[in-house]
Swiss-Prot record:
Family affiliation: Belongs to the bacterial histone-like protein family.
Gene, per the UniProt record: ihfB
Lineage of producing organism: Bacteria, Pseudomonadati, Pseudomonadota, Gammaproteobacteria, Oceanospirillales
The protein's name: Integration host factor subunit beta
UniProt xrefs under PROSITE patterns: HISTONE_LIKE
Pfam family, one: Bac_DNA_binding
Amino acid sequence: MTKSELIELLIDQQSHLPVKDVEQAIKAMLEHMSDSLANGERIEIRGFGSFSLHYRAPRIGRNPKTGESVELSAKYVPHFKPGKELRELVNLPENSEINELN
C-alpha cells in the first residue's frame, strides 16, 4: 500500500472528513515520525509495533560490478519491530494466502 492508497482508503472510510484534512493528517504524521527517528527517538504504537534506529558498524564492502573493496562508514538505519497483535493478525488462518506468497 502506498501513501496515496492509504489516503484514498481513509477518505472512503471517513467520508465526513474533508480530503485535504486527511491528506494533511497523514503527511503530518509521517513527517513527525521521520523527525522523531532522525532525532534518535523511538516510536511505539501499541498493538502495531515500534520504530527505532539500529547502528551499523563500519565495514569493508565490495562493489558488485568491479569486486573492488569499498570502505563503508558507520550509520544508523531505521528498524521496525512488529507488535504482538500485528504478528498474530498476519498469521491467522484466513491470511494463509499472504503466507503462501512468501
